[in-house]
Structure formats: structure tokens, C-alpha cells
Regions:
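Conserved P-loop NTPase "ATPase switch" module shared by AAA+ and STAND
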Residues: 66-82
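Conserved catalytic segments around the Walker B and adjacent sensor/switch elements
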Residues: 26-40
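Hydrophobic positions on the alpha1 helix immediately C-terminal to the Walker A/P-loop
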Residues: 18
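Short glycine-rich substrate-engagement loop in P-loop NTPases that contacts/grips substrate
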Residues: 38-68
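Single conserved hydrophobic/aromatic residue that forms the stacking wall/gate
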Residues: 1-8, 12, 360-368
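Structural recognition of the conserved hydrophobic beta-strand(s) that form the central parallel beta-sheet
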Residues: 99-105
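Accessory nucleic acid-recognition modules appended to NTPase machines
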Residues: 184-358
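Interdomain motor-coupling "hinge/lid" segment immediately C-terminal to the ATP-binding subdomain
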Residues: 112-231
Length: 368
């Protein structure tokens, strides 16, 4: 059984496309059901986990034959189903011959709030925004990508201007598939920003789901503070920058919600540079980054032309976009554990420490 966690609006069409294309290529039938707002399936697991009944209902709703090994069952937005995640255990134990894939935009939040995918019963895949490498491929720049991978520094230096231009494009567009698709199809920066703003609107709507109005307000306050937090010379998250006089207890649940939802990444400071980095983690000092550098520009209300042409925006942001970019590229790699280091006197800082077999120190220039 396969579970896909994804950032909200990864987008829905892209996630659905991936699952359905996989089903079309590998199976004779695809029984797809979107569980969000679907009253027909809302209480399918409320009474019991009778798999014979459950499979019959899925077949009736999807209008597809449910055949072992030949039908892929896809339950989209499974977090909207009562006991939906828990049901995967019973699919695995009582109906192992049936193939099931599930997906959702707030699975991390659902798991944190009590529901969880059964241990050992589910393979979990997390989808990230498109990386710079994937952006180059989408632009049909495979040759340029191969040169970068070759580490032929002389050739790379000769191509500096072209690489810088494309990197600026990526800083602006980011890796959200709908934004990339719009940019490549129209070359219209204003339409791209409209797509990004639509995504941010959906995020804000999500922030009011499954939490109290008071907690939703706190989540929104933390979210809106991230651009200004990252535009500081010292990017350590400051609670007082969210609300004057605020303390950790006021906003720690809001931060955890954003992390669980996959909308932000929390990168902790380490007190010393040593392996494993986890031994030296300082839980009281951390930075918060957005899931996508393009959305950071939109949330910051940065004019598209400033990002695509001007250096002023990059220098005034004090490396916010560059650090967010580097982190998102690191996190696309598997098994990369990322922290940062700073001395108490703040005179020495390593922007990122990545642990992968050995320690990798990464410090960023201010602009691309």
C-alpha cells in the first residue's frame, strides 16, 4: 500500500495526474475517489472495517470493477475520511491482494492529531516542489544540466550569465508545478504570480481546518512573519517578531502545525559541529523556511521584475531567497539531515550543515 504526502496544491491536479497515470500504465482499471466533500464515502469506515463491504462501496462509487492485482484503488484526500488512515492496516491484513494508493494534503497534520498510517503496512512517499534540476529539464535545458553535473568549471564559468538568468527565473517561479507550467506556456510573470497567490489563498483556507479560530489566527501570524524573519541578518526565529512580548508557548503549536502540513521547514541550530549532528541540536534556536522559493517571493509581495532583473531585491533580502533556495534543493535529496551552526557571539555562522555520510558545510552568497 502506497501513501503520498504532498504540500497543498502541489498541486491537486499534478498529484492526481501522477497517481492516475501510474494506474493507467500498470493496471487494467483505476478506481479513483476524491474523499474531500464526498458524502457518499465520508463514513465508509465509521461502523467497521469489513473489507468485503468497503470494496463493494468503492466499486459502486468509482464505477470500476475491483479486481485483485488488476485494479488500483486511489483514495485522494484520505485525511478527510474518518478512520481513513487507520483503514490501511485492514486493507493490508484482510485484503492484501488488493492494491491501494492514498494521498492527502494535510496528512502530516492528521498524523500529529492522532490518526497515523500503520507502521510497516504502508510505503510513504513525500512529494516536493520541482527542484532546479527538474526546472532545467522542463525548460529543455538538459545539455546545460549535464554541464553542471560534470563540474566542468571552465565551461560553467563561460555560461555564467545564462545560468544566472535561469536561476533568477527559478527564484521567481519556484517549483510548484502549476506555476512552472504557466511560466513555460505563457512566459507571463504576472500570470505566474497570480497562480502563486491562488496557492497562498488555499493555504490560508487550510489554516482554519481542524483547529480552533484562535489557533488558526496564530498559525496565520507565524506564516505571515516568515518573510521578515528571513530578511534579518540573523535569521533565527524570534517569537517577539510575530507579536510583541510573545513567548514560545504562545506559538509553538502554530509552528508545529505549519511543519506538519509541509508548508514550512524548521531547521535547528547545533551547538557544536560534530557527528551525528542530532547530538548537538539546540531545540530553542531554529529558523523557519518556506516550502518553495517562488512562494516566498509571492508571500513577500516582491515585484516580479525585481526578482527577474534587479539585484537590489536580492541584496536587501539579506540572502533570504538564496538560503530558502539552497535548503529546498537539499531537502529534495534523500537522507540529508540539515541544521545550521552559530557561535554564541554571533560572529561565526554556517548557514547549513548537511549530514550525509560526512558533514558538508554550506555558506551562501547574497545573490545569484
Amino acid at each position: 500500500h502506497l501513501s503520498i504526502r504532498r504540500q497543498r496544491q502541489m498541486c491537486i491536479r499534478d498529484r492526481t495526474y501522477i497517481l492516475q497515470e501510474f494506474g493507467k500504465q500498470e493496471y487494467d482499471h483505476v478506481a479513483y475517489i476524491n474523499c474531500d466533500g464526498n458524502s457518499e464515502i465520508a463514513n465508509i469506515f465509521a461502523e467497521d472495517y469489513d473489507m468485503k463491504r468497503v470494496l463493494m462501496v468503492i466499486g459502486a462509487i468509482s464505477k470500476q470493477p475491483i479486481i485483485p492485482g488488476k485494479t488500483l484503488i486511489i483514495l485522494d484526500e484520505i485525511q478527510e475520511l474518518h478512520k481513513g488512515l487507520s483503514s490501511l492496516k485492514y486493507f493490508c491484513e484482510n485484503a492484501p491482494e488488493y492494491h491501494v494508493a492514498v494521498a492527502g494534503s494535510l496528512l502530516g497534520v492528521a498524523m500529529h492529531q492522532g490518526e497515523s498510517a500503520p507502521v510497516g503496512k504502508v510505503d510513504i512517499i513525500r512529494l516536493y516542489p520541482m527542484s532546479f534540476e527538474e526546472f532545467l529539464m522542463a525548460k529543455d535545458e538538459e545539455q546545460l544540466l549535464n554541464i553542471l553535473k560534470s563540474k566542468d568549471w571552465k565551461t560553467i564559468t563561460l555560461l555564467h550569465d545564462k545560468l544566472t538568468k535561469i536561476l533568477r527565473e527559478y527564484y521567481f517561479v519556484g517549483g510548484m508545478p502549476e506555476a512552472v507550467k504557466t511560466y513555460l506556456a505563457t512566459n507571463d510573470a504576472n500570470l505566474v504570480r497570480q497562480v502563486q497567490n491562488n496557492i497562498l489563498t488555499i493555504y490560508r483556507s487550510d489554516m482554519s481546518k481542524h483547529v480552533s479560530p484562535n489557533e488558526a489566527t496564530r498559525i496565520s501570524m507565524v506564516w505571515q512573519s516568515i518573510p521578515s524573519q528571513l530578511a534579518k541578518e540573523n535569521k533565527k526565529f524570534i517569537y517577539g517578531a510575530v507579536r510583541s512580548g510573545a513567548r514560545a508557548k504562545d506559538f509553538e503549536m502554530a509552528i508545529q502545525w505549519l511543519v506538519d502540513a509541509g508548508l514550512t521547514y524548521r531547521i535547528s541550530r547545533v551547538r557544536e559541529v560534530g557527528m551525528p549532528l542530532k547530538f548537538y541540536e539546540d531545540l530553542n534556536a531554529f529558523k523557519l523556511f518556506l516550502l518553495d522559493v517562488g512562494l516566498l517571493g509571492a508571500l513577500s509581495e516582491m515585484e516580479p521584475a525585481q526578482m527577474l532583473i534587479s539585484n537590489k531585491a536580492m541584496t536587501e533580502s539579506k540572502g533570504a531567497f538564496t538560503e530558502n533556495y539552497v535548503l529546498t534543493q537539499l531537502l529534495c535529496q534523500q537522507d540529508i539531515y540539515t541544521y545550521y551552526y552559530s557561535r554564541g557571539d554571533a560572529r561565526l555562522e554556517i548557514d547549513f550543515l548537511a549530514q550525509h555520510l560526512s558533514l558538508i558545510h554550506i555558506s551562501e552568497p547574497t545573490r545569484p
